[in-house]
């Protein structure tokens, strides 16, 4: 059972801003209800401006959390942007590898980059939830499906099985205190959906936000990100992807179809689709671009035998499950479940 949680801000410093303090207070009360001790790392609440200017402070918090023998779980406050700027402060002199110990690491979105960092140094991680978007949900409680997996992770230190949610929720546009106690609008969901290939396949899951992966290869958003990712060999090789299951989900920016095609093409050119045993696709927020994304997946992958399963409750669309990376997963679409060894 998890006893001590360290919260880190590895991307955007939203948790330290006054406009988010009502959310932080909600989240801390909920974590107290689980009986866990919570600490914010020294720089986690220093706000957007400070953390944008000081990536070394973000890196220092992560290293300190790993080095602290009392910390059982490292929970990301939120995603955001530019966590790639931590690369020199974590990989020069092999700092991250030397600091890493066996702890739970949970985050999503821009945190995809941190997942790839930790994969590179051999630490299995957990993808799918974060403090502000999930624990600090403004409604009367955490969303039930989301809470089910968060509670399982706290209680057991792992996830054994993932099944679909019965509902999906419209994305919030107002996070002000006026929304406290108001649940998001819910709609019936349709379960895991097989787009192509075999309904059963297995392998270790690895992946994350496709918007972030696009930035690994294209410097339009961050001119130096592709160069830094190449310098530190951050994107896994085709050999590393061999036999794995690729996870992809889209951000709140609702990636335009032409950019989605380009992102898939980057992955294809990197040899990912030839290497993996299957692909899992998270539900897009508010179901935007669902049909065109389906078409583009089939066109770009161009291999009808490769299993592709869509409509997973993972990523930016609520509710969110948690997927373990680095452990064997068995996907069974007919049974509507993913089980983990």
Regions found by a protein language model. Give the residues of each.
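ATP/NTP phosphate-donor binding region
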Residues: 1-70
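Oxyanion-binding "anion nests"
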Residues: 205-250, 255-256
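ATP/nucleoside-binding phosphotransfer catalytic cores, i.e., glycine-rich phosphate-binding loops
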Residues: 259, 265-268, 278-341
């Amino acid at each position: 059972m998890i006893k001590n949680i360290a919260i880190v801000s590895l991307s955007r410093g939203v948790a330290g801003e006054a406009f988010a303090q009502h959310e932080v207070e909600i989240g801390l009360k909920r974590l107290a209800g689980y009986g866990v001790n919570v600490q914010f790392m020294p720089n986690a609440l220093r706000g957007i401006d400070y953390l944008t200017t000081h990536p070394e402070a973000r890196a220092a918090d992560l290293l300190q959390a790993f080095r602290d023998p009392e910390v059982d779980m490292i929970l990301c406050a939120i995603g955001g942007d530019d966590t790639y700027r931590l690369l020199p402060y974590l990989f020069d002199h092999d700092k991250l590898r030397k600091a890493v110990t066996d702890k739970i690491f949970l985050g999503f979105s821009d945190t995809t980059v941190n997942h790839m960092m930790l994969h590179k140094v051999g630490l299995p991680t957990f993808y799918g939830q974060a403090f502000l978007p999930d624990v600090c949900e403004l409604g009367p409680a955490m969303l039930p499906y989301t809470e089910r997996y968060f509670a399982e992770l706290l209680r057991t230190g792992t996830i054994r099985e993932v099944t679909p949610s019965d509902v999906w929720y419209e994305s919030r546009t107002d996070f002000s205190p006026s929304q406290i106690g108001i649940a998001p609008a819910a709609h019936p969901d349709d379960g895991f959906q097989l787009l192509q290939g075999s309904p059963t396949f297995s392998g270790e899951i690895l992946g994350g936000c496709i918007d972030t992966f696009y930035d690994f290869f294209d410097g339009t958003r961050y001119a130096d990100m592709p160069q830094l990712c190449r310098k530190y060999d951050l994107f896994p090789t085709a050999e590393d992807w061999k036999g794995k299951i690729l996870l992809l989900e889209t951000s709140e920016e609702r990636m335009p179809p032409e950019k989605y095609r380009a992102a898939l093409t980057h992955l294809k050119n990197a040899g990912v689709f030839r290497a993996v045993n299957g692909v899992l696709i998270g539900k897009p927020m508010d179901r935007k671009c669902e049909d065109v994304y389906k078409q583009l997946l089939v066109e770009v992958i161009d291999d009808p035998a490769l299993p592709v399963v869509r409509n997973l409750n993972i990523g930016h669309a609520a509710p969110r499950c948690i997927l373990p990376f680095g452990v064997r997963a068995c996907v069974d679409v007919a049974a509507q479940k993913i089980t983990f060894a």
